């Protein structure tokens, strides 16, 4: 019984430790552009059914409720909470924020398409629009070297002002991706996600089409992490960890008490001659 109780409390320690790790990661990314906070979800482990509901207690009566003992808890997953972050102005023409639904598409080095809310873009030596890491956005948009002014409309049309030209010239169209199940996306680091069978295939459209959001030029989407909320969760996690640790200590004391009592009962009594 004692070792079972210790095991249950240990599962609580492990679960709270995982939750603390997620909270720490949220706080570490409080200033990461486009970062989405995570929330840990718990579930109970299997129950030991010692007496079933309806079990006969006498000739005319039955047990009204079961006697079941839980065996602990575990972390089942960590959901990404894709609520909108604040739009912060940067006055940089190549900074873009998605206000609403949608992800930017980026070609990763391994050939996969990465999806991100981080719109910190720049140009490479060929004029292509890239992320800070140099990954080219998809579909590719090339800005002419002699462009004097760059404009990105709310529906994703990229236009530039060239020397001597009266009107701006359209050079590309930024498209967004969305998914049936955002939480099915697999985060891979560097603010990128990749699609999985759980997320479903990407739905591609221009900004402002259907339920897609709009683009905001000269701005970035800040993290949706609330420091106050994370600190409250941290204190709650710490208290839960301490309680589970205390449970282990209490069970250990109970076992030592039983061991000492059993020793006293089994020791032979010395006869006084």
Please identify what each model-predicted range represents.
Residues 1-262:
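Amphipathic alpha-helical polymerization modules
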Residues 263-269:
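Conserved small/polar residues in nucleotide/adenosyl-binding loops
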């Amino acid at each position: 019984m004692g070792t079972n109780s210790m095991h249950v409390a240990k599962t609580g320690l492990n679960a709270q430790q995982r939750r603390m790790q997620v909270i720490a990661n949220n706080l570490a990314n409080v200033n990461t552009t486009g970062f989405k906070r995570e929330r840990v979800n718990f579930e109970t482990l299997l129950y030991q059914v010692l007496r079933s509901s309806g079990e006969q207690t006498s000739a005319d009566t039955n047990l009204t409720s079961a006697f079941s003992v839980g065996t602990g808890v575990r972390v089942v997953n960590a959901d990404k909470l894709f609520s909108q972050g604040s739009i912060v102005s940067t006055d940089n023409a190549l900074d873009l924020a998605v206000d609403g639904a949608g992800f930017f598409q980026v070609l990763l080095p391994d050939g996969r398409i990465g999806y991100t809310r981080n719109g910190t873009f720049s140009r490479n030596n060929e004029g292509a629009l890239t992320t800070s890491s140099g990954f080219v956005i998809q579909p590719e948009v090339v800005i002419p070297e002699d462009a004097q002014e760059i404009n990105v409309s709310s529906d994703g049309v990229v236009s530039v002002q060239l020397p001597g030209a009266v009107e701006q010239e359209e050079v590309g169209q930024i498209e967004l991706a969305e998914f049936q199940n955002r939480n099915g996306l697999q985060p891979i680091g560097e603010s990128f996600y990749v699609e999985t069978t759980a997320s479903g295939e990407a739905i591609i459209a221009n900004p402002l089409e259907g339920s897609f959001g709009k683009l905001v030029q000269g701005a970035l989407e800040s993290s949706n992490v609330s420091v106050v909320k994370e600190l409250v969760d941290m204190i709650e996690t710490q208290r839960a960890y301490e309680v589970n640790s205390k449970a282990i200590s209490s069970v250990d004391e109970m076992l030592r008490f039983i061991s000492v009592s059993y020793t006293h009962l089994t020791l032979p009594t010395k006869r006084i001659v």
